[in-house]
């Protein structure tokens, strides 16, 4: 095929996907909300200095939201607005990094299983079946309990809990793509396996994988918040949203805003990723739309 025609077809496909996505109002709402949250995380130091979130002021303990403290203060007199703004970095970093790690590791394993099959595929998938038999939250708890509660171990635990689903998804998509005639043609011309996988298999399998990864970020953020809430994730005084909820438990009746505000932030962030993921799914394959 002429390179110019091939380039035109790719551009046309991209424009069609973008058009479908832009027509989806809920997806656009999710995208706007997500961009707003990402902008807050990126510009956190410009919006409010981090020091305001760690300075303790005993005189201003449990101050309700007002003009001086937009979100009020906590039990140590720390500015909750500053802690929420800078906490967005923790939650987004955990959600995005764990999803990308699971995608890279799970994508590599799943691609090899789907492309080669055989004994390697059987052995890996039986191991993944064992991991999937354990609920993701319990698996994460077990890993954190074994390694210790901190940010690094939380990332490891959530990535491991996400791996089985990623491996199975990538494997199933790669098996479907690998059965196409152009893959057999590439093999018959003596193409190396790595080149075939990277040039033909991966690009044609990216649609479902991108959608799944986008939507998994929301699950990862919720998992991290849940583990931090029970003291098995990010530890205080780090302002991760789940850790903020954990700190607020003891004073939930005296200062309920300490629970409501981080909870709403977690909800809106997870919702934005889910809406964008749904929109991408419908744009990439309109047949999947309900």
Task: Tell where the protein language model's regions lie, with residue ranges.
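Glycine-rich helix-loop "coupling/hinge" segments at transmembrane-helix boundaries
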Residues: 144-146, 158, 173-174, 222-265
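Short hydrophobic alpha-helical segments within the ABC transporter permease transmembrane module
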Residues: 83-85, 92, 127, 134, ...
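Transmembrane alpha-helices
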Residues: 89-105, 140, 194-226, 273
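Short helix-capping/hinge motifs at transmembrane helix termini and TM-loop junctions
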Residues: 44-52, 114-118, 143-149, 161, ...
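Residue-level hotspots within pore-lining transmembrane alpha-helices
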Residues: 89, 131, 135, 144-148, ...
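Generic hydrophobic transmembrane alpha-helix motif, especially the helices
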Residues: 70, 74, 80, 104-108, ...
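Gly/Trp-centered helix-boundary motif
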Residues: 1-107, 111, 118-119, 133, ...
